[in-house]
Design a protein with these regions (language model features):
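Short S/T/G/P-rich N-terminal loop/turn motif that feeds into the first structured element of a domain
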Residues: 1-49, 55-66, 76-93
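Low-complexity, intrinsically disordered Gly/Pro/Thr-rich segments
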Residues: 68-72
Length: 93
């Protein structure tokens, strides 16, 4: 598996209902076995974190164009991003 974690800053307090709708709309794009899951979580009222789980680095790279388009369209400021191959997964041990 391959992970992407990001932190995002909003100009206003997070609209969680709208964000759930946005994520639901992305399900059609992410309906393959290559995107395992996407999770968004609140850090504070104007900052959220994101975890994307891909089946492989290649799957992540394949999704990059669509992901970057969504990022640009969001109007949010990305504070950080980390990516990497998993090497230990508790549910697999």
């Amino acid at each position: 598996m391959y992970m992407v974690t990001t932190t995002w800053r909003h100009d206003k307090p997070i609209d969680k209902v709208n964000m759930r709708k946005i994520l639901s709309g992305l399900k059609d794009r992410n309906n393959s076995n290559e995107v395992i899951d996407v999770m968004w979580f609140e850090i504070d009222e104007v900052t959220h974190g994101s975890v994307l789980i891909y089946s492989s680095k290649e799957a992540c790279e394949k999704d990059m164009k669509a992901r970057n388009t969504n990022r640009k369209d969001s109007g949010l400021k990305m504070l950080r991003e980390e990516t990497g191959e998993t090497f230990a997964v508790m549910s697999e041990l």
